[in-house]
Amino acid sequence: MKSPLLGLVVWSLLLQLLQPGLAFWNSQISQNCHNGSYEITVLMMNNYAFQESLESLKTAVNKGLDIVKQRLQEAALYVTVNATFIHSDGLIHKSGDCRSSTCEGLDLLREIARQKRMGCALMGPSCTYSTYQMYLDTELNYPMISAGSFGLSCDHKETLTRMMSPARKLMYFLVDFWKASNLPFKSFSWNTSYVFKNGTESEHCFWYINALEAGVSYFSQVLGFKEMLRGNEELQKILKDPNRRSNVIVMCGTPQTMESLKIDWTATEDTVIILVDLFNNYYLEENATAPDYMKNVLVLTLPPGNSTINTSLSKESLQEFSDFALAYLDGILLFGHMLKTFLRNGENTTAHKFAHAFRNLTFEGSTGPVTLDDSGDIDNTMVLLYTSVDTKKFKPLLFYDTRINQTTPIDTHPTFIWKNHRLPHDIPGLGPHILLIAVCTLAGVVVLILLIALLVLRKYKKDNELRQKKWSHIPPEKILPLETNEANHVSLKIDDDKKRDTVQRLRQCKYDPKRAILKDLKYSDGNFSEKQKIELDKLLPSDFYSLTKFYGTVKLDTRIFGVIEYCERGSLREVLNETISYPDGTIMGWEFKISVLYDIAKGMSYLHSSKIEVHGRLKSTNCVVDSRMVVKITDFGYNSILPPKKDLWTAPEHLRQASTSQKGDVYSFGIIAQEIIMRRETFYTLSCRDQKEKIFRVEHPDGLKPFRPDLFLETAEEKELEVFLLVKNCWEEDPEKRPDFKKIENTLAKIFGLFHDQKNESYMDTLIRRLQLYSRNLEHLVEERTQLYKAERDRADRLNFMLLPRPVVQSLKEKGIVEPELYEEVTVYFSDIVGFTTICKYSTPMEVVDMLNDLYKSFDQIVDHHDVHKVETIGDAYVVASGLPTRNGNRHAIDISKMALDILSFIGTFELEHLPGLPVWIRIGVHSGPCAAGVVGIKIPRYCLFGDTVNTASRMESTGLPLRIHMSSSTIAILKRVQCQFLYEMRGETYLKGKGTETTYCLTGMKDQEYNLPTPPTVENQQRLQAEFSDMITNSLQKRQATGIKSRKPARVASYKKGTLEYLQLNTTDQDSTYF
């Protein structure tokens, strides 16, 4: 069965892709709604279901604008009011079908956003699909007026106004008419019905019948029996069936619909058909006659409106418009009425108040006064017509005012086709027979006598049980502690300590000879009141598979405990938190979730029908899971002993006044259901995380929509929506609108059939299937843990390889130690940033961290392409060595030289984000010689280098020049020895601290490869160089201020937007170094 709810879900996913555009569109609300010029945007879509041309709708809108302008002038308000028509060209969206209107609506929304043509309000769309998605995903902050949108999904939307009767109003009438038993022509209340659906209904009929079909709708919840008839074949079969379960059939259509069915009324004289045909003025015309096939039909329609007081709209001019076009016209008049009201009061028409003001009001429409209820839906008076057997005409039977939900009979002596001119009973074969009345009276007398006798016997039995003290019959010596091997249980959970602590607090014990839980009743003397004794006595006989067994009470030391059945898998809350043992993909699938909800509903249904009557503290921690994966309810029946608490599961009426009720348990079930479905924290909502604030907002609602958890309907599939709607019904603000657990149980049983094909499966089969699922999951979990261990081992290896050289890590893994080693010849590279202190002076600490991180990440990438080892970074210094820990002959000098050239080439292209235009200068020093290396320390071990070679390389860097590679003569000698084609120039004699004066060189490139090296600064004097660099920084800061470049936010540690952030990317800085 295809449901329109599926369309809503599919299109909501599509709409997520357009959120940026819609957000922009949402920001244009005040574009054409101020300074004396006010526009209404009219969204016109090709919907053939209404059989109305766009030109006719434009004519109706323009007619409404003329009236609005006239009324504003009469009120001395001289402003400009216009309409902007938005519609597609019909080239792409050709179907004109309501189900495909969402795509067309999205295109029109983008057109509005692109052209910035949004006015004060939006008129349209008319289809429930597009209206629901626009309201759901765009967070409308302006009034939206719709001529249509009949479906239940558009009910109670804060800024949506509907100008045609929605399905909700129809259901109110049907329920009131079904329950009426004191009308002159109806002596029985009805509780059954068939609903006919042939799949060819008009737009409004489609949504009316769909609402009656929904299992969670008001109509379905109230009726004891309801069945859908799909197609003429099923209808004819039911009409001819003498054992049918109802005489009443609801359908939507026209007299032509009835004629096409070709019903044989001679075989169905007790049948009553309610034909919903609201938008058809044919029945009340003077020359209208009722065909013979309408004699068993009651027609529900809307009477023609009263003549308008506006001389600009005559009856003749209104006849050219259909009800759909008149709804557009009335929408324009409503906009004009609200505009006049706000302008008179000097209020802002773009404010939040204007968007929520289109409700609870009456204005002058095209055919008379129009009233809107507190949800923004139109109220009107429906009329129920019948066919007179005398005149063969349609006559009014009753009026129904949707504003006050009141039925007013018009014809007290109708000339019906039915027997005695009264409507028949809804169940075939029932009626006011004298014999039946006599039997019922006699049975009532007998029942009354038996009831009196039962009450006397019950009172005697109760007093006798209280005297025997059955509620505290367990001697303390029968409560035994658990043995050691029983207390220690194997678990696959990694962090199981918390769970074991929770179990210990519950005081596990052994009783006859089962495991049990001791429930602290918080009484020290054991002197219960008579009410409390009665309450405890009711718990003993309760024995149901979805309830934990209560064994009695016991006094240990000075405290009283209840002895309750133990369930091995803990509470439902713990199971939901355990995502490893109970993953979503296998065990905790939708079928299992529905089964869990059914277990709870089954247990609560039994509990409510038992002597216990009410739970009072139903929550996910009071639902436990046994070894067979059956959910049981516990902690019930102590309402007079344990005072009620204000919890997230507590119903709002009980938060305001501490008490308990069955409807309050239904609310608690709704909160538990949301926990199970979402598998999140209790009462999960994105708008609030504080528990006390949640409880306060539930207890004190601040608007029409009460505060409830999030359900994320837009991501739900078709079958899941039935569950979501049931949950929403369970946490209704009005307790009377919540279903009882019997209805919840039946609804879940039907929903379970949608998820599970084996509908005739026994309870034992279901139980075995659950255990098989759990067993397969354990096997999968063991395999997954093995893979997880291997992945963690490999990740630890990768981390070690980032901290230490690979040979060093291998030695540590194999031997546990790393022997220090002396290397005859290695090449060490040092570099640091010129003017780093000056840059820090003009930068924030976070900007300095960002600068070093961006620079050294790029250095690390260059290092990966050469046979070198990064030793460490010390502040702005970067240290690299080659030739260790793996010796590479004379290649160490070649690799360091090539790496230095690559780094210097990169520096020429690097630019600081917070100081645009400022060049980054580095000094590079390289030296070759012997060196010792080894791992130092146990905690945060370091692979350190020792020797004069390291110090000399550092001196080469500190005495070098900006943007130059300063090399010692030993490195140049190695390069000459291997005959590599490196280009270098002699710098001359350079003084090195601790070594004296030596001849040094500058590496400038290679003969067979071009490097784009930056041009070094020409200033030789150090002081002039520093002054020039300071001027550059000052100019860069002025440039940043002039162009409005903002620095990075200092709230974070560093920016990693140029690369993937992984915990393997480490950056450590030591205060002291072993090299100096």
Swiss-Prot record:
Subcellular location per the Swiss-Prot or TrEMBL entry: Cell membrane; Endoplasmic reticulum membrane
GO annotation terms (biological process): intracellular signal transduction; receptor guanylyl cyclase signaling pathway
Main localization (coarse): membrane
Domain-related comment: The protein kinase domain is predicted to be catalytically inactive.
Domain Protein kinase as annotated: residue spans: 492-752
Signal sequence coordinates: 1-23
Family annotation (PROSITE patterns): GUANYLATE_CYCLASE_1, GUANYLATE_CYCLASE_2, PROTEIN_KINASE_DOM
Similarity remark: Belongs to the adenylyl cyclase class-4/guanylyl cyclase family.
Annotated Gene Ontology cellular component terms: endoplasmic reticulum membrane; plasma membrane
Keyword Ligase in record: no
Residue intervals on the Extracellular side: 24-433
Lineage: Eukaryota, Metazoa, Chordata, Craniata, Vertebrata
Keywords: Cell membrane, cGMP biosynthesis, Endoplasmic reticulum, Glycoprotein, GTP-binding, Lyase, Membrane, Nucleotide-binding, Receptor, Signal, Transmembrane, Transmembrane helix
Membrane-protein topology: Single-pass type I membrane protein
Glycosylation, residue list: 35, 82, 191, 198, 287, 306, 310, 348, 405
Subunit structure: Homotrimer. Interacts via its C-terminal region with NHERF4. Interacts with the lectin chaperone VIP36.
Membrane-crossing segments per the record: 434-457
GO molecular function: adenylate cyclase activity; ATP binding; GTP binding; guanylate cyclase activity; peptide receptor activity; protein kinase activity
Domain of life of the native organism: Eukaryota
UniProt modification remark: Glycosylation at Asn-62 is required for interaction with VIP36 while glycosylation at Asn-348 and Asn-405 modulates ligand-mediated GC-C activation.
The protein, known as: Guanylyl cyclase C
Topological domain ranges for the Cytoplasmic compartment: 458-1076
Reactions mediated catalytically: GTP = 3',5'-cyclic GMP + diphosphate
